[in-house]
Amino acid sequence: MGNACGGSLRSKYLSFKQTASQRHDTDDNNNAAAADSPKKPSRPPAAAKTDDHPVSASAPAAAMRRGQAPADLGSVLGHPTPNLRDLYAMGRKLGQGQFGTTYLCTELSTGVDYACKSISKRKLITKEDIEDVRREIQIMHHLSGHKNVVAIKGAYEDQLYVHIVMELCAGGELFDRIIQRGHYSERKAAELTRIIVGVVEACHSLGVMHRDLKPENFLLANKDDDLSLKAIDFGLSVFFKPGQTFTDVVGSPYYVAPEVLLKHYGPEADVWTAGVILYILLSGVPPFWAETQQGIFDAVLKGFIDFDSDPWPVISESAKDLITKMLNPRPKERLTAHEVLCHPWIRDHGVAPDRPLDPAVLSRIKQFSAMNKLKKMALRVIAESLSEEEIAGLKEMFQTMDADNSGAITYDELKEGLRKYGSTLKDTEIRDLMDAADIDNSGTIDYIEFIAATLHLNKLEREEHLVAAFSYFDKDGSGYITVDELQQACKEHNMPDAFLDDVINEADQDNDGRIDYGEFVAMMTKGNMGVGRRTMRNSLNISMRDAPGAL
């Protein structure tokens, strides 16, 4: 697209540039290498503001003004716990997850650092939500002692939050470690896969199904020790009995097993997901890929595995045999975790060759990890750049849903508002919308969050908004985005700027070292931006697209 359409699209961009509004005060959550933290920054994140800290003292009225929990919320853990601040000194924010924020904390009695995931009780809307948190803590304790599972230190509860203190994984994300090594071989991939599948086997032997295995849920406790790989985030994990089947669709699109999409699955789904991770470790790309989320699901159900494209012609037959058996679309014929560990390719001192993989594989892994960051930053820029005229319809919709005129939409208001607009979403799907839109984990959706969420659904591909986002990154107005300009934007958003060269290289189709407008549009409209816990965006889009006042 950079060659064929770049000129005309760049002209459109330049013609729009003078009228494209933009703001530079958008905010982002710092990411760090710790439990519940998706990425490691290139530099330490700034210390969290005291006013934003979940364990800072604040009056109930102030908490309510911020949309936090009222002081009289019932107990989640079901028993009294010590005061977290009596035991730990709280530090900087490490990461922002979908259901909680992770902070660095230091045990006062020992000086040992830990990670503390703080979950807002306002997000625990139903009895099921409360049970989910209890179960996550129970499962972490149940798996305690496994060397490759993050260790839980304790769980605490106050008026506003549930806090889970756990082992600090300061060594970074799995993919980041692979990239840093430089030399990367099938044998190294086999070692890493052996650890990952070992965790799966341990979970299954203890009656636990993880249900959300993915590379970002494996972190290193020590950056110098590959064997310190730890599985984190058991928020979607469940206990199961032999023969028991599950029907709720959870997980992430690239990694979800076909039987999960068909709503009839068991622990075999974890083995499928581990097979997807192995495919990515060896090639740098997911095995089931499409331009849309629905396309990804269709590819998963079709089950075709590409072993013809590079680098697969030089990958060993034994590796491909293992992947084929892990990605068997028939769960009962799929290898168990124990059988995977017995496969010749993966066994210690097995047949996996030690010759280096094509460097392009490392590059693909970097791109796969980095691209979504830029898209999400651009999405926030677009949301902040909308004119008052353009968001009038969405503003009206927001005001209609905000029944008490508080400036924030609660779960009940969202549910009732969507019903008025003809939505047939289930309660769990509405809860998913809350999770996706509630950026600051306040338990409510404020005006900017609402605009960003609805923009994500039905306005991303509007050209004038793409122009506004491009204009934000194109600091000098040259019509091109450079690495330096992306670094500046990342600094403004407090985002890590590692691997921006790879973002440029993937989007730069005419190889001139920069991104023109046509290439930017291609990047923004290609593929899937990532969905968290469950998928409901398409049905919501249908409901809202025809609603009164929808844009």
Swiss-Prot record:
Residues reported to bind Ca(2+) 4: D508, D510, D512, R514, E519
Predominant cellular place of this UniProt entry's protein: membrane
Induction and repression of expression: By cold and salt stresses. Induced by N-acetylchitooligosaccharide elicitor. Induced by UV-C.
N-myristoyl glycine-type lipidated residues: G2
EC number assigned by the record: 2.7.11.1
Annotated spans, Autoinhibitory domain: 352-382
Key words of the record: ATP-binding, Calcium, Kinase, Lipoprotein, Membrane, Metal-binding, Myristate, Nucleotide-binding, Repeat, Serine/threonine-protein kinase, Transferase
Presence of the UniProt keyword Nucleotidyltransferase in the record: no
Expression sites (tissue/organ): Expressed in vascular tissues of crowns and roots, vascular bundles and central cylinder. Expressed in roots, leaf blades, spikelets and developing seeds.
Family, per entry: Belongs to the protein kinase superfamily. Ser/Thr protein kinase family. CDPK subfamily.
UniProt note: domains: There are 3 contiguous domains conserved in the CDPK subfamily: a kinase domain, an autoinhibitory (junction) domain and a calmodulin-like domain. The autoinhibitory domain (352-382) inactivates kinase activity under calcium-free conditions.
UniProt function note: May play a role in signal transduction pathways that involve calcium as a second messenger. May function in signal transduction pathways that positively regulate responses to cold, salt and drought stresses.
UniProt protein name: Calcium-dependent protein kinase 13
Organism: Oryza sativa subsp. japonica (Rice)
Gene symbol of the encoding locus: CPK13
